[in-house]
Structure formats: structure tokens, C-alpha cells
């Protein structure tokens, strides 16, 4: 599976999350061999858990499935730039690569805000890449919040 196909799966998860009333963010975690280890969307409201971001859920699911807290070689695909909490989990899990579609100037921690992986205290720095239609990914979020305001 290539980056565009995997990010499309993450966007589908984001749309499903939005359909459940969650902020529409989706994530997919692939093994080094390109197999889907886990895929999910935000479930913060459903689980009554502020840490139930899509990235956290797929990291937890993959670690449990593999019976290993290290996800070395794995690539995380996310519809939106990960926040600081998720960046910390990415580093702790040793995810090798992170690919996201839309930037998050307000809450992102990769290209914006704390730039988590650029900090001298960060012990693991995954490769960062972009894929997918950033405008389309951003529009999913914009439409979700527009509908909530009306």
C-alpha cells in the first residue's frame, strides 16, 4: 500500500469519526511490510476519554496485537497533524515514520507549536512526510465545525 492509499484510509476513518459526532480525525498504522496493523478515528466522546485520539487508539491497538510496545518500522498515517500528546506517544512507541495530510496551526505539534520532534529532549525522531489532499482533509474538519456552529 502506498502513501496515498494509506492516507485515503485515514481520511475515511476521519469521516466515520465525524459521523459519530467526534472531531473528524483518522489514523492508520502500517507495518514495515505494508500491512494494516490498526485503523481508527477519534473516540473521545464515545469513550469519555480525552486521550482517545485516533493516533493513540491505533498505537495502543497495534502494540497490543503485536504484544510489543515498540512499533519500529511502522508508519502512522493521520488525516491531521498530530498534537503534542500524540507526538509523545509516537516517540515512545518508536514509530519510524509519520505521514499526515492537513496541517494544524492551532493544535499541531510537528510543524507547528512545540515542534515536538525538534526538541533536544526528544529521544526518537521519526521521518515526517506529507501525503493526500491537504485541502480536502482540512475541509472535512471545517465542514464538521461549521455544522456544529449552525
Task: Please state what every model-predicted region is.
Residues 1-20, 36, 82-150:
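Zinc-dependent deaminase
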Residues 10, 14-17, 27, 38, ...:
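Small-residue (primarily alanine) positions within well-ordered alpha-helices
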Residues 25-34:
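Short beta-strand scaffold segments in enzyme catalytic cores
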Residues 37-44:
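Short beta->alpha transition motifs characteristic of CBS
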Residues 46-56:
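A short, polar/charged loop-to-alpha-helix boundary motif
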Residues 56-69:
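Short, charged low-complexity linear segments at domain edges
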Residues 68-80:
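Immediate flanking context of iron-sulfur cluster ligation sites
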Amino acid at each position: 500500500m502506498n502513501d496515498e492509499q494509506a492516507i485515503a484510509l485515514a481520511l475515511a476513518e476521519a469521516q466515520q469519526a465525524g459521523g459519530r459526532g467526534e472531531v473528524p480525525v483518522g489514523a492508520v498504522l502500517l507495518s514495515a511490510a505494508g500491512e494494516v496493523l490498526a485503523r481508527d478515528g477519534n473516540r473521545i466522546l464515545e469513550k469519555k476519554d480525552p486521550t482517545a485520539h485516533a493516533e493513540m487508539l491505533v498505537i495502543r491497538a497495534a502494540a497490543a496485537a503485536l504484544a510489543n510496545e515498540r512499533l519500529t518500522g511502522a508508519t502512522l498515517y493521520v488525516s491531521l497533524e498530530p498534537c503534542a500528546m500524540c507526538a509523545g506517544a509516537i516517540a515512545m512507541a518508536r514509530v519510524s515514520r509519520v505521514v499526515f495530510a492537513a496541517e494544524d496551526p492551532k493544535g499541531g505539534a510537528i510543524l507547528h507549536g512545540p515542534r515536538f520532534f525538534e526538541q533536544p529532549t526528544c529521544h526518537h525522531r521519526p521521518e515526517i512526510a506529507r501525503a493526500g489532499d491537504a485541502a480536502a482533509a482540512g475541509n472535512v474538519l471545517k465542514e464538521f465545525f461549521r455544522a456544529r456552529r449552525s
